[in-house]
């Protein structure tokens, strides 16, 4: 039986509560498998279960939304909730900062802990002094050619000028911009005040749980900035502005390449559903953003930057696979329970180089393949499923796949997918179908 036919037949009309429950249970499973139960089922099966939870969430969300109309929200109700959303955002932010503060205080920025922030500081220092940013770093214990895209380090130029710790700046961006975008979309949903309050505090609760479980996660990295970008992307998918959609795409593409396979699917959906004009505006603005942020100021001065960065990724992967062994003699980050690299390390070819190559090819095939699957399902179900929700659910499934097959599945990287789940859960309501804003071409 075809997957689309199965979804239609396996979805009793009065079973919306079942799909709602499935989404919440899947979110709980993802959170547990990244916090208290991380690696509980072993380094081989824990990442499989984590990915399965993401698949279940996407399946339940699709089943919930089939044949449900995406109604518009009332502006009066939205305006009433915006101040409350802002208050809850501040309260949640204070909760996160109170938990994050001890972690940052006990982990100074030093190569003794991590090289991530030191590298970002070097980029920023070079940029502010007018030096060439993309040349070999000489302040580390090993030679490294810069392999970070501009929007991984450019946001910290103001922080550096103001003398603010990059980690606080990153968390502030997530709380104010990323979660602010989430709160704005949530305020527009026709749901009860109780459900609104519960969902309003959900993102900050996830951050708190992640930090409490592993204080290093956002104290040794600036990952909250990247999570912020993807929250903006998820919110823009549900919004109406071509400018915001393009801005979010530029932020994501120019910080990491993670979303690159999903972008053509999203533009195709916009072309079909909204119209060629809107899709072309989004594509053009995104292209201009990439040119303005990366190609013209940096890449055009040295076209080998891109290939150098790819080579550094390979070198870093070899270093992780061949070293950083834990008590069991196995690479710590590969066997941390967040990615299937452990399977390829255990059962792959004898040579480590060959194992990595097999995983990289599988990663590309899986990432591209899941986009093809999502596109096919969207096309088959386009009459029963709102395209904006199809794009959001597709983004969740794609990112879950992409990060599951990473060559170095760091916990802080994988945590990003959890916050896309929050947007999916936000869109399934306890009472009636939540609202999705009508999309028009607007700047």
In which residue ranges do the predicted regions lie?
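Extracytosolic helix-loop segments that constitute the early lumenal/periplasmic catalytic or substrate-binding loops
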Residues: 116-141, 304-307, 316-319
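Membrane-lumen/periplasm interface segments of specific transmembrane helices
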Residues: 27-33, 278-395
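Membrane-interface alpha helices of multi-pass inner-membrane proteins
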Residues: 234, 243-267
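Transmembrane-helix motifs of polytopic, lipid-linked glycan transferases
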Residues: 166-193, 374-376
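Perimembrane helix-loop-helix junctions
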Residues: 262-288
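Specific aromatic-rich, kink-prone transmembrane helix
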Residues: 223-241
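Aromatic- and kink-enriched transmembrane "portal" helix at the membrane-lumen/periplasm boundary
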Residues: 153-154, 197-224, 399-407
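Start-transfer (signal-anchor) and selected internal transmembrane alpha helices
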Residues: 1-99, 381-397, 425-443
